[in-house]
């Protein structure tokens, strides 16, 4: 039972010794390890052995996430994303501009070389303006289906017409004292008695000249006599047969009493 375990252990130990001896033979065979009489020669030989070991041994990830990736690796990693490019800090091209590789590939076509690029002079300004325009477009699109989508100016109050001819003005344009005075004038306007008396005299004179004022513009302005007071009072002609009936009745009664 112990023999197979010892056999495996010896095989592993032999492989390790053979590998170390091969590395040491490579270090000794290099030209840097030829002169080992001085300290500088020994240090150079040690450096050569370290480089050989690092080249053959596997590289484990250490602080690799802190180091910037190369452009080819970035392109390969980001191709499966929808936005397919890095931000400003990571997407520096060969010419130092803050544009992604996708735009660089498009600009490399010979057709675009015929037209001068106006955005090369100020790339930073265009990058800042693009998100603002995009936000405005999104806002306009989202508010189109509402009836208040577009901002409306200040609403105008309807003008109220009063019988005295005074239009209501905005109360905000007057201070408190003027508001009170204006309200008093609207509620109790000042009246000159002399002018009113003269106006009444003129109106009475006009009515005397034209005769009695009747409401001709209404259908009940001058109703016929037979329909006045709801038809209870009939004209004089209709009252004569009734009087004769009364007379006849009285005469008959007197004759009966006399008999």
From Swiss-Prot:
Modified residues (Pyrrolidone carboxylic acid): 26
Primary location: secreted
Xref: InterPro entries: Mcrtin_ACTH_cent (IPR013531), Melanocortin_N (IPR013593), Opioid_neuropept (IPR013532), PMOC (IPR001941), POMC-derived_peptides (IPR050878)
Residues bearing PTM Valine amide: 152
Protein family according to the UniProt entry: Belongs to the POMC family.
PTM info: Specific enzymatic cleavages at paired basic residues yield the different active peptides.
Key words of the record: Amidation, Cleavage on pair of basic residues, Endorphin, Glycoprotein, Hormone, Pyrrolidone carboxylic acid, Secreted, Signal
The gene coding this protein: pomc-a
Removed propeptide positions: 104-137
Organism name: Xenopus laevis (African clawed frog)
Positions of post-translational Phenylalanine amide modification: 86
Positions of glycan attachment: 90
Leader peptide range in chain numbering: 1-25
Protein name: Pro-opiomelanocortin A
GO terms classed as biological process: neuropeptide signaling pathway; regulation of corticosterone secretion
CC terms in the record's Gene Ontology section: extracellular space; secretory granule
Lineage: Eukaryota, Metazoa, Chordata, Craniata, Vertebrata
Cellular location(s): Secreted
GO MF: G protein-coupled receptor binding; hormone activity
The keyword Glycoprotein is annotated on this UniProt entry: yes
């Amino acid at each position: 039972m112990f023999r197979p375990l010892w056999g495996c252990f010896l095989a592993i130990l032999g492989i390790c010794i053979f590998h170390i001896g091969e590395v040491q033979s490579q270090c000794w065979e290099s030209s840097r390890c030829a002169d080992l009489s001085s300290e500088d020669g020994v240090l150079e030989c040690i450096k050569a052995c370290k480089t050989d070991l690092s080249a053959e041994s596997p590289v484990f990830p250490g602080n690799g996430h802190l180091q910037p990736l190369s452009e080819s690796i970035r392109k390969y990693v980001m191709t499966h994303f929808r936005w397919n490019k890095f931000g400003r800090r990571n997407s520096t091209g060969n010419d130092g501009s803050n544009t992604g590789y996708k735009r660089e590939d498009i600009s490399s076509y010979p057709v675009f070389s015929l037209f001068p690029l106006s955005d090369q002079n100020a790339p930073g300004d265009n990058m800042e303006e693009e998100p603002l325009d995009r936000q405005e477009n999104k806002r306009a699109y989202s508010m189109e289906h509402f009836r208040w989508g577009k901002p409306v100016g200040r609403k105008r109050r309807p003008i109220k017409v009063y019988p005295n001819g005074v239009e209501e003005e905005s109360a905000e344009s007057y201070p408190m004292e003027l508001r009170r005075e204006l309200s008093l004038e609207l509620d109790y306007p000042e009246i000159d008695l002399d002018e009113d008396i003269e106006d009444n005299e003129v109106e009475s004179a006009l009515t005397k000249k034209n005769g009695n004022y009747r409401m001709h513009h209404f259908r009940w302005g001058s109703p016929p006599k037979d329909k006045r007071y709801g038809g209870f009072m009939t004209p004089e002609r209709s009252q004569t047969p009734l009087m004769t009936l009364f007379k006849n009745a009285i005469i008959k009664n007197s004759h009966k009493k006399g008999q």
